[in-house]
Amino acid sequence: MKSSEIRQKFLQFFQSKGHTIVPSSSLVPANDPTLLFTNSGMVQFKDVFTGKEARAYKRATSSQRSVRAGGKHNDLENVGYTARHHTFFEMLGNFSFGDYFKREAIQYAWELLTQVYRLPAEKLWVTVYQEDDEAYDIWAKEVGVPAERIIRIGDNKGARYASDNFWQMADTGPCGPCSEIFYDHGPEIWGGPPGSPEEDGDRYIEIWNLVFMQFERDAAGNMERLPKPCVDTGMGLERIAAVLQHVHSNYEIDLFQKLIAAAARETGVKDLADNSLKVIADHIRACAFLIVDGIIPSNEGRGYVLRRIVRRALRHGYKLGQTKPFFHRLVPDLVAEMGEAYPELAQVAERVAQVLRQEEERFGETLEHGMKILDGALAKVAKGDPLDGTTLFTLYDTYGFPVDLTADICRERGVEVDMAGFEAAMQRQREQARAAGKFKMAEGLSYEGAETRFEGYESLELSGVKVTALYVEGTQVEQVSAGQDAVVVLDATPFYAESGGQVGDTGLLEAGGVRFAVADTLKIQPGVFGHHGTLEAGALKVGDTLLARVDAVRRARTVRNHSATHLMHKALREVLGAHVQQRGSLVDPDKTRFDFAHDAPMTAEQIARVEAIVNAEVLANQATEAKVMAYDDAVKGGAMALFGEKYGDTVRVLDIGFSRELCGGTHVRRTGDIGLFKVVSEGGVAAGVRRIEAITGDNALAWVQDQNALLQRAAGVLRAPAHELPERIVQVQEQLKALEKELEQARTKLAASAGNDLAATATVEVKGIKVLAASIGDVDPKALRGMVDNLKDRLKPAVVLLAAGSADGKISLVGGVTADLTGRIKAGDLVGFVAGQVGGKGGGRPDMAMGGGTDLAALPAAVASVQKWVDERL
């Protein structure tokens, strides 16, 4: 039976039992900020189970896309090494919201497994919670499972109700026993039944978990029975498919076999049993569906988990000999397998492939070099020793290797990793950042040697450079040892030192067994470049000769942003006027941030014009030209000198497109190298100073793609083409206003009706005055005021007090006194008297007052006390 057929039969079976088929929710949980990803079928129904949300149905069934990677639920490190761990899986489930309970849930499960899927009954074992006699009796007496195949599991995790067979959503809230169904693969496979010492073997495999939510647990641990118990079940599609297709490993089912074959095709591997192919087949599913749900590779949160999964897949491709982008080419194969069940995948397949290819290209630039670093480090690790934390950190920080990826590689080689050392290196970096760069304290170091010859305009790699000075913690030294932070001065360098708003370069200084990771480059004196970083290996001495290599990827992104800044500056002057002058800038690999003199926010039209002008220059693909000349000649030739910058007699003039500025920074060779220019923000930073931020190249492309994906999602939600969204949003807003008006009218009518009922049934007479005090359920304060006004007019002379308790425990109070009684009784006093009894306060005019409280339990007595309070004042 194919996986698609198994999924379809499951949903159709429960549909025939009165269940509504509910589509899979997003992998990004909509109602649970504590979850990184949707990891089970019940996540989208959590608020239904807790009573916060009502649905039009009481029975539901779904096939839920799920991810367990990152956060509390993380299977990433096990994928590729076990038969059943996945980052992405499908959870088949059926749910009852206060409708049926244990008997039906158990009978449905048994019927589906034995009659629809035709599994041999004698192959099925079940577990129940030790104290759940009800479930035990249903299995034994009604279903007919022999007692020897029903196992009671008690509290086996060290606390009351801490059991494999007792489920709870959190420390408090809905919870209850569960019953798990296991499939026996037979005696030829090692392992014992659940609860036995050999239960971790592979003979008995759990295929379905039936959770019976029948208790509410309070903070003290007390259990109260729920008035309407619920059912939540989950069965992994991949696991049941393995059973029905008579294979032992999930990776042998039809769905995975086709993806594994596709991975073999793209990597050129003939051995389909290779574990790396399993990893790639698993990871393409997780990565593709995460992108479908709007997640993009990044360095934080869900985006970083996606990046880790992609890079793990690429590393396994590299291990198989594939050094070129290949992962994105598996998307069509995935669509062929899962596009029918999940049409959202087919709809954005091109976008998914684009995002994956960009990530492949980004990581591919550093993967090979990083692997060489790792291979070299592993070759030096003595037997039984771990890989040092410094190397772990270098691979993470410089080469983009997630630490779990490096640990994965080490595990294959039988080497542990020094996580404590890695965390220590991370902490050092955090401390350096908090101090605005520990290394930057070295600016102004005493140095009496020759200036550094800068070769970085033409080359990113320079051999034979000589160490002319070394500094550790501000003190000049002759030698630096491995693990020390230091500043290295060279006689020549390709590293650009931070200047003119452009950040300094990063990279490596190497020679033999010496490796110095450059984290920043600054001028410690005019013309003297300090390479700030950490000696990761070897010993470094003054006079040593090194190979200096700049991080080319980072430099390329930085120069794109720097060159775009020049074009943007010129464009701003054209659009806003010649008064625009630079007031500050920051150019780094991620963006350009440009502060300029202007006294008003830019309009959307002005920003669009700036973008159009800059991108026109980019498309013109003009060559960049730099000349060195006298300062006076440069200014006479039209070169723009920047505010606040100091220039010598001789300056460097940069012509890029239509811009000419004095600039010593590094730049693209042609304007077309910028790729794409996009403004992402504009705002004020001081009086008369605006700040604009822009991105270029692959960052700009990714931003545009993200915005387009967001637009398409919005179009899907509003069921309108993207170009019609503004009109559709206006239409929805108008509909909302109309509905709000109708709701208000309905509330007014209901309030009037309720008021009539109260006037007839709840009014008492005290010394000739009509007194009405009542609690009327959940009514909003505005409607409550209207009711009090109506009752005053109808009953006068009268004193009226109405209270309404909301679902969130808040109490609204409104008191009213007719004008002829305000000399003796004040509405504000009345409301204050009642509010004080329910944990609140109130006040207002003599004839009308409002208040509130929070003690719902005290409300009935407080309302009942009004009659006596009025009597005492008449």
From Swiss-Prot:
Taxonomy, top ranks, is: Bacteria, Pseudomonadati, Pseudomonadota, Betaproteobacteria, Burkholderiales
Tell me which species this is from.
Bordetella bronchiseptica (strain ATCC BAA-588 / NCTC 13252 / RB50)
Sorted alphabetically, which keywords does the UniProt record give?
Answer: Aminoacyl-tRNA synthetase, ATP-binding, Cytoplasm, Ligase, Metal-binding, Nucleotide-binding, Protein biosynthesis, RNA-binding, tRNA-binding, Zinc
Name this protein carries in UniProt = Alanine--tRNA ligase
Q: How is the cofactor bound?
A: Binds 1 zinc ion per subunit.
**What's the encoding gene here?**
alaS
Q: What does this protein do?
A: Catalyzes the attachment of alanine to tRNA(Ala) in a two-step reaction: alanine is first activated by ATP to form Ala-AMP and then transferred to the acceptor end of tRNA(Ala). Also edits incorrectly charged Ser-tRNA(Ala) and Gly-tRNA(Ala) via its editing domain.
Instruction: Give the family per the record.
Output: Belongs to the class-II aminoacyl-tRNA synthetase family.
Q: Where on the tree of life does the source sit, at the highest rank?
A: Bacteria
Query: One biological process GO term for this chain?
Result: negative regulation of DNA-templated transcription
